[in-house]
Amino acid sequence: MADQLTEEQIAEFKEAFSLFDKDGDGTITTKELGTVMRSLGQNPTEAELQDMINEVDADGNGTIDFPEFLSLMARKMKDTDTEEELIEAFKVFDRDGNGLISAAELRHVMTNLGEKLTDEEVDEMIREADIDGDGHINYEEFVRMMMAK
């Protein structure tokens, strides 16, 4: 999987890896993994980090070497918001299936997620994502918003 990375990506990952390999022994500790990945623009949850560490740290010694790290990053990058996932997420918000997310639809989904938002907050979210200014979020605007996170 790491063979799908460009030389530039590998060099970038090596540089980040080296920053956290304090003693230069070619390994980083598992608790440093989250810091390394965040420095590369990934945003794993604690649960995801634990899963990744469990997958990579086969001997359970608490350290990860560079080849393991490369494999991990390649896998993580491949998993980053595929088009199918974005389409599915858009459909969750676009409750009436008209290809647009309205303020009411956004409020409904956010409320179901436990986010109690004021009308002003919902309107602000729409405004931030609404590139063409029609008061709704279309699929293209949704993708841009999701990729900007």
UniProtKB/Swiss-Prot annotation:
It comes from the Eukaryota. Keywords: Acetylation, Calcium, Metal-binding, Methylation, Repeat. The modification N-acetylalanine is found at residue 2. Ca(2+) 4 binds at residues 130, 132, 134, 136, 141. Signal peptide: none annotated. The keyword Repeat applies. The modification N6,N6,N6-trimethyllysine is found at residue 116. Residues 8-43, 44-79, 81-116, 117-149 form the EF-hand domain. Ca(2+) 3 binds at residues 94, 96, 98, 105. Ca(2+) 2 binds at residues 57, 59, 61, 63, 68. GO terms for cellular component: myosin II complex. GO terms for molecular function: calcium ion binding. Pfam families: EF-hand_7 (PF13499). CDD domains: EFh. Ca(2+) 1 binds at residues 21, 23, 25, 27, 32. The keyword Transcription regulation does not apply. This protein has four functional calcium-binding sites. Belongs to the calmodulin family. Calmodulin mediates the control of a large number of enzymes, ion channels and other proteins by Ca(2+). Among the enzymes to be stimulated by the calmodulin-Ca(2+) complex are a number of protein kinases and phosphatases. This is Calmodulin.
